């Protein structure tokens, strides 16, 4: 038995979906514990592309139970459309393979409206939110006025919450943002219908996980976004609205922290970032554009082009510290093929000092200059390689340098988008 947390070690989009899909073969349960449909996992299985925003990536495997924990914010319309697409693809979604925490909070139409109205008003100072209502939903959760999944089956409670919340939201939308008000009655009927559709899947995920632990099952916890988008530990304010670090796996699913056995970090072989915020190793040249094109670096949720740059080990080492990582899972190594000279950021120069971990203040980070180590690239196609020793010598040197800088062993090296285009050095289960 092992309970393993998978997190992103950079700014999200590291390729966690493929890794979770790979490890699900030996897991019994796959659990989402934070975030919402602002993140997308892209998987390629048997040449077919699947994009998930809310349903855990393990849904493609028969006999596995996927769970959406209490720490996730759920847009029920998005979830139902995702379930319908899976059904059309021959993967029916039932309580045999998907459970939703009754305590997960629900994204409402006024959350999306507020999200977009605020972002539009900010103009050039906007953060780059996806506009999916994630942040406003978490705000209502903290303000103790949010709608939870179990409320969707209670017409009285749902109606009262919608009407009470719309008093404030409509006032702001009309008077402050100049937007049209939302209709409470129509919203209530829409969400009661969602509740009826989702009711068979709603359960106490915390209790089900405790039963799984007692039975000695393998549980895989699937993080969304990346460490440096964490609301507390990320590059604030250019962050998401939830805790993305491994410590939230327990809180966001209802399992005790002592039940977690291992925490593994996914690291893209280069670095990407979506939206605003500091990015010390960003490339604004042909190499950066090459990474974006070859790596398909466009958001699975928004389609926005991602900013690209060299692998930054200051970013990765900070993630190792924050999450207590015991292994690294390298993705998109094949994207670097054909680049003559590669660079890795080894430290930052901040005035007279050299530092190896990210400074917590945004202003300090923006003032830092990256210090690089240069490596020879490789020309050979590595997509068919399945053993580490069969990789080109320069590829191995790049990975070995990464591992040495991290002080944490490599467990997986992905050499292509497909499930089988992977070198597995160690399984966590």
UniProtKB/Swiss-Prot annotation:
Phylogenetic classification of the source organism: Bacteria, Pseudomonadati, Thermodesulfobacteriota, Syntrophobacteria, Syntrophobacterales
Its EC number(s): 6.3.4.4
Quaternary structure (record): Homodimer.
Chain residues that bind substrate: 300-306
Species whose genome carries this gene: Syntrophobacter fumaroxidans (strain DSM 10017 / MPOB)
The protein's annotated pathway: Purine metabolism; AMP biosynthesis via de novo pathway; AMP from IMP: step 1/2
Job of this protein: Plays an important role in the de novo pathway of purine nucleotide biosynthesis. Catalyzes the first committed step in the biosynthesis of AMP from IMP.
Binding note for cofactor: Binds 1 Mg(2+) ion per subunit.
Protein name as catalogued: Adenylosuccinate synthetase
Any Pfam family the entry gives: Adenylsucc_synt
Recorded family membership: Belongs to the adenylosuccinate synthetase family.
UniProt key word Cytoplasm: yes
């Amino acid at each position: 038995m092992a309970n393993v947390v998978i997190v992103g070690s950079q700014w999200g989009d590291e390729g966690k979906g493929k890794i979770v899909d790979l490890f699900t073969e030996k897991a019994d349960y796959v659990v989402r514990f934070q975030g919402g449909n602002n993140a997308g996992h892209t998987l390629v299985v048997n040449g077919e592309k699947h994009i998930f925003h809310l349903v855990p990536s393990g849904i493609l495997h028969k006999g596995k139970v996927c769970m959406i924990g209490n720490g996730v914010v759920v847009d029920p319309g998005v979830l139902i459309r995702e379930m319908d697409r899976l059904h059309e693809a021959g993967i029916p979604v039932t309580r045999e393979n998907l459970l939703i925490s009754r305590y997960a909070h629900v994204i409402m139409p006024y959350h999306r409206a507020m999200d977009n109205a605020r972002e539009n008003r900010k103009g050039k100072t906007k953060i780059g939110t996806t506009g999916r209502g994630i942040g406003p939903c978490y705000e209502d959760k903290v303000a103790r006025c949010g709608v939870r999944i179990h409320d969707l089956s209670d017409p009285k409670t749902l109606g009262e919450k919608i009407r009470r919340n719309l008093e404030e939201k409509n006032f702001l939308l009309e008077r402050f943002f100049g937007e049209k008000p939302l209709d409470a009655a129509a919203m209530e009927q829409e969400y009661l219908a969602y509740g009826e559709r989702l009711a068979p899947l709603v359960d106490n995920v915390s209790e089900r996980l405790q039963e799984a632990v007692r039975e000695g099952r393998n549980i895989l916890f699937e993080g969304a976004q990346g460490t440096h988008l964490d609301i507390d530990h990320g590059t604030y304010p250019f962050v998401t609205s939830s805790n993305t670090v491994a410590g939230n796996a327990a809180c966001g699913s209802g399992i005790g922290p002592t039940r977690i056995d291992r925490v593994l970090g996914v690291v893209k072989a280069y670095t990407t970032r979506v939206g605003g915020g500091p990015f010390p190793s960003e490339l604004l040249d042909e190499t950066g554009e090459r990474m974006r094109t070859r790596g398909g670096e466009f958001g699975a949720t928004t389609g926005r082009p991602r900013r690209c740059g060299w692998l930054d080990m200051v970013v990765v080492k900070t993630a190792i510290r924050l999450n207590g990582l015991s292994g690294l899972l390298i993705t998109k190594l094949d994207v670097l093929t054909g680049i003559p000279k590669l660079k890795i950021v080894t430290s930052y120069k901040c005035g007279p000092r050299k530092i190896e971990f990210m400074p917590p203040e945004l202003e300090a980070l923006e003032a830092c200059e990256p210090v690089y180590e240069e490596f020879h690239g490789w020309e050979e196609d590595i997509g068919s390689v399945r053993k580490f020793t069969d990789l080109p010598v320069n590829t191995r040197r790049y990975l070995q340098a990464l591992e040495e800088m991290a002080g944490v062993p490599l467990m997986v090296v992905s050499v292509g988008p497909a499930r089988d285009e992977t070198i597995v050095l160690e399984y966590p289960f």
